Amino acid sequence: MTIFVHIINILIFINYIKMKQICGLFVASLAVLASCAKQEPLVIVPCQIWPDNNGVHVNAHGGGVLLHDGTYYWFGENKCDTTSLAMVGVDCYSSQDLVHWTNEGVALAVSDDPESDITRGCILERPKVIYNEKTGKFVMWFHLELKGRGYEAARAGVAVADNPTGPYTFIRSGRVNPGILPMDLDNEEAKARLAEIDYYTYDESKNPQAEEWWTPEWRADVDAGIIAERDLEGGQMARDMTLFVDQDGKAYHIYSAEENLTLNIAELSDDYLSHTGKYIRMAPGGHNEAPAVFFKDGTYWMITSGCTGWAPNAARMFSAPSIMGPWTQYDNPCRGENADITFGGQSTFILPYGDNFIFMADIWRPKHPSDARYLWLPIQFDENGVPFLEFMEKWDLNTFKAVAD
């Protein structure tokens, strides 16, 4: 009888333990469900006023976002109400969630020294910042045009800081890789072709009988490198640009060259402060600007725009197995109404967000530059893994899905 009682007690204890475990799992499940239910939506509203912590529209145009130590830093052009000239410099904002932004002030200020390359009234566009793990420095590159010279200078500028919010110290500006041929032209066949042609043929400023641009013959000569050779001694032109840090830590400067006709992808030095001389021409003669790059599942993707000034146009898209190519062009990645004008925007950056990617673009307002808006959209992928974009009036960062009104 005593043994029987012990057995009963043991069974009751075992059953108690099991029930406790089940209850624990049930409570944990309820906690997870409650957590999900309480998760606040992080809503992105494209094309509208985006207020910062002071209730003022974010002023960071043509910019990019850096994630560092769990904080996002958004850098962009500070634009004034009446001019697109650089009267202030590059602004910086910080955020923990990509929705609510704190104004951190001016990261790179223009100079009051009239002899400085970045003197007040220059053109300073498309600033991007990357962090160098080896040096512990934050490096900013940007497109620079010297004051009073329009878009003639076509320079790249570089600045550096010890902290993400700055202040950034301007180092220098100039054209890129002077005296060095791009990799695709540095071979005997390409050099022989270049020896047969001369930019003077198309130079209206020096040749009264100059031949017209945009003919099939002109396009063939551009493809062959006639403008790259013209700019060889002084360095390649560098206008609209972005930066990209690859999986191995190498960084690349990607910019519009050759009168905006051709993109260059140039490797940066280990400290990210200069170029190594290794670079390629991409889509020669294609007239691309506003490059934005990301990497997914072994493929490099780039979205660009055409060249129509402040007016929007159809986006272009390219992919490659290596950052140095070869690059293959795709159709316009945008779908739906206003796809032919990229929903009114122009690409500036693609931001990785977990396993997802955010397409960042600007909606320019040239008559009121500071009122330019931001077009942020989730990048989607079709059944073949090809990226595409659809406009959403509102969408949630938690789900990457549209939010109903």
Task: Pin down the residues of each PLM region.
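Bacterial Sec-dependent N-terminal signal peptides
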Residues: 1-40
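Carbohydrate-active catalytic/glycan-binding domains of CAZyme proteins
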Residues: 13, 36-405
